[in-house]
Amino acid sequence: MMWFDPANPEVLFGDQRSETVTVTDRSHRTDGTRTLRIEPDALLDFRALPFADGAFKLIAFDPPHLTRAGPRSWMAAKYGKLGPDWRADLRQGFAECFRVLATDGVLVFKWNETQVKVREVLALTPHQPLFGQVSGRGGLTHWLVFMKPRAA
């Protein structure tokens, strides 16, 4: 989804699902559908990453950001949806990212604050971003960059 070259051997794309879904949306296709393919290299849960401490120098963390979505929502089908314990899930996700991140490693975090403000999410981790960029329609998508400190 964010990768320019999903076949790059230096990249490991993980998701908790592997599926192909056809959804109805306002696409420009004549039949009004869109086919989504979620094809991760590894099935995993960001709350319990199956990697050794310090295994990665760079991590891109792009968790689901929707708390509400209809049963046929293409956004939920594409990006996933947060569960009722989303605060605990994201807190654990940040902890796991920093656990498997090498010292001085970089975490790139992407968040869209249409439903949950980025400040609420940042309150779930003791780490502060070094810098970031706001993008997207309405300036709601945040790209934040963290670096794992030596003492973390």
Residue ranges and their predicted role:
Residues 1-152:
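Class I S-adenosyl-L-methionine-dependent methyltransferase catalytic core
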